[in-house]
């Protein structure tokens, strides 16, 4: 890379945002410097990536597990699995794209893929349980993760002495050392983490919070290399309880990329990391490490375009606005780059590609949109008894309530039913109806006492927010996600039988010739493999000759 190009960006850009957002004379200066160095779009992206990875590489480096060897992968099975989550995308979006754009990357992939048209993500349909479903094979009942932000009756507050038990648990960008910096200011700030009184009042990192192991841990302990890229340093949780599941974890902070265009640049940053990994290097492109056995990333642009005012959908059939369609095209072009790189490296035959989403976004039909009154639920609970609400998460398209006195649950539910229409409440889960879906809140310290599903189209967002869609609830538009599994030996196949994204994890291990029951969640919940996959055919696939 040209040193002058690198120096220009390294000196002037605190975060890698599109230079159009820099104002005044500084913008003119940057434009001049850019002109002088004759930056192309590709050069800008290369410079951004170099700056970012230089910041993130030191805090992402991981030592090899003690005593671990890296044996050559089996030659009688798929050697690599690429897992891609297109956050926000619905199954209807994939179906429409394949029909309307037959030359798109996704349409071409579908010709050699098993497409599950009736796939559902977790409930709640939040990013954390959504991704954990894919990488553990389990529901929130076994992962212990209900939502990105929640409440735990067994933990203590950050910066406390653990004398008081019960605290809100926050695992979003707010636990970064600096959430406006692309590297999170150096990662997670331990002082912002909840504490575990049973373990000497020590901080609970995201990976400590997970109750079951992940595919990354299983594959790494079997001698494979692992890599993942996602939107916050808090995605440390993919490491699993060992804290060491991912060899190469790349988590640039998405908060530092505001607006749709900058979110596309953010996705480009992670795509560049994937291309480096396909080339057999780490995400920075600086070290030869070999192509990962399991690797992947999430895409953000579609979800941002769905949520942003002026974007979203035109009607309930899934017809897209110009900005949402642009985000879809940009993401599809990124997929084409990834597939081209796999082809260039002769890795298509030895790689299984899985495309899905952690969640959808609601509503699709813009006429159903309604912003909830965020004061109604807490005021109603307080009317039963002041201080009864220990924890509350009104986020996206679901509300979760933890009570300080669980014996008053029925009283709170009765009060909520009196405001059901005013508050836009479709369903209240509590008592036996809640226990049909989740662990008993009296025995599991993380399970809410009450879960509220709002009426279709209603979302819980901050006052004054211009968001037009969100996720988290049980609505079809929250949970209906694409699921496409590609291999060049496959023909086109569509399976309409209902499946869950939790079935991805055991299917990945099976495709790699590993035992799915090495996953804790699979053993506990008896998670089945995805139907319709010819694992015998995959294990007979001989990798194409070429550099690995």
Where on the chain are the PLM-derived regions?
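Bacterial N-terminal signal peptides
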Residues: 46-57
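Active-site neighborhoods of enzymes that stabilize oxyanions during catalysis
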Residues: 191-194, 208-213, 387-514
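Catalytic-site neighborhoods of secreted/periplasmic enzymes
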Residues: 173-258, 519
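Acidic, His- and aromatic-enriched active-site or binding-groove loops in soluble protein domains
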Residues: 140-148, 243-281, 317-332, 373-393
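Metal-dependent active-site segment of extracytoplasmic phospho-/sulfohydrolases and closely related
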Residues: 330-372, 508
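Active-site His/acidic residue clusters
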Residues: 232-255, 281-330, 337, 367-370
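Short, structured active-site-proximal loop/turn typified by the sulfatase FGly-forming signature C/S-X-P-X-R
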Residues: 94-149, 225-227
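Active-site-proximal N-terminal segment of extracellular/periplasmic enzymes that hydrolyze or transfer
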Residues: 64-114
């Amino acid at each position: 890379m040209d040193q002058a190009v690198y120096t220009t960006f390294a000196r002037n850009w605190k975060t890698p945002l599109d230079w159009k957002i820099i104002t005044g004379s500084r913008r003119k200066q940057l434009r001049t410097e850019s002109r002088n160095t004759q930056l192309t779009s590709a050069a800008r992206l290369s410079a951004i990536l170099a700056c970012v990875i230089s910041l993130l590489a030191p805090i992402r480096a991981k030592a090899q597990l003690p005593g671990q060897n890296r044996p050559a992968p089996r030659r009688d099975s798929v050697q690599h699995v690429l897992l891609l989550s297109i956050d926000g995308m619905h199954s209807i979006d994939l179906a429409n794209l394949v029909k309307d754009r037959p030359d798109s990357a996704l349409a071409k992939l579908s010709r050699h893929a098993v497409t599950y048209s009736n796939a559902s993500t977790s409930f709640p349909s939040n990013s954390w349980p959504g991704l954990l479903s894919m990488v553990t094979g389990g529901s929130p009942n076994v992962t212990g993760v209900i939502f990105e932000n929640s409440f735990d009756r067994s933990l203590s507050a950050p910066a406390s002495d653990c004398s008081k038990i019960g605290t809100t648990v926050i695992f979003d960008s707010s636990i970064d050392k600096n959430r406006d910096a692309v590297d999170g200011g150096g990662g997670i700030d331990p002082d912002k983490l909840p504490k575990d009184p049973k373990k000497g009042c020590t901080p609970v990192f995201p990976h400590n919070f997970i109750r079951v192991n992940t595919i990354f841990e299983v594959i790494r302990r079997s001698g494979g290399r692992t890599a993942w890229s996602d939107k916050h340093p808090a995605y440390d949780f993919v490491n699993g309880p060992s804290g060491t599941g991912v060899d190469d974890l790349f988590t640039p902070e998405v908060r530092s990329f505001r607006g749709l265009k900058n979110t596309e640049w953010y996705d480009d940053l992670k795509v560049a990391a994937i291309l480096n990994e396909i080339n057999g290097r780490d995400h920075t492109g600086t070290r030869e490490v070999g192509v990962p056995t399991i690797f992947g990333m999430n895409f953000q642009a579609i979800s941002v375009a769905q949520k942003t005012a002026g974007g979203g959908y035109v009607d309930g059939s899934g017809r897209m606005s110009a900005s949402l369609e642009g985000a879809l095209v940009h993401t599809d072009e990124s997929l084409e780059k990834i597939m081209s790189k796999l082809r260039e490296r002769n890795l298509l035959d030895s790689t299984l590609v899985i495309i899905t989403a952690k969640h959808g976004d609601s509503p699709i039909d813009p006429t159903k949109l309604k912003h909830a009154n965020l004061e109604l639920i807490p005021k109603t609970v307080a009317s039963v008894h002041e201080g009864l609400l220990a924890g509350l998460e009104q986020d996206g398209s679901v509300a979760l309530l933890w009570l300080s006195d669980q014996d008053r649950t029925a009283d709170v539910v009765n009060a909520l039913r009196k405001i059901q229409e005013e508050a836009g409440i479709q369903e209240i889960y509590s008592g036996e109806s809640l226990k049909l879906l989740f662990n008993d809140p009296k025995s599991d310290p993380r399970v809410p006492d009450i879960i509220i599903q709002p009426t279709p189209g209603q979302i819980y967002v901050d006052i004054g927010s211009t968001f037009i869609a969100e996720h988290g609830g049980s609505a079809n538009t929250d949970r209906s996600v694409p699921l496409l599994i590609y291999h060049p030996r496959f023909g086109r196949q569509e399976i309409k039988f209902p499946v869950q994204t939790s079935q991805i994890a055991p299917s990945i291990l099976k495709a790699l010739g590993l035992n799915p029951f090495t996953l804790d969640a699979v053993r506990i919940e008896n998670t089945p493999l995805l139907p319709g996959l010819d694992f015998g055919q995959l294990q007979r696939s001989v990798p194409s000759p070429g550099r690995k």
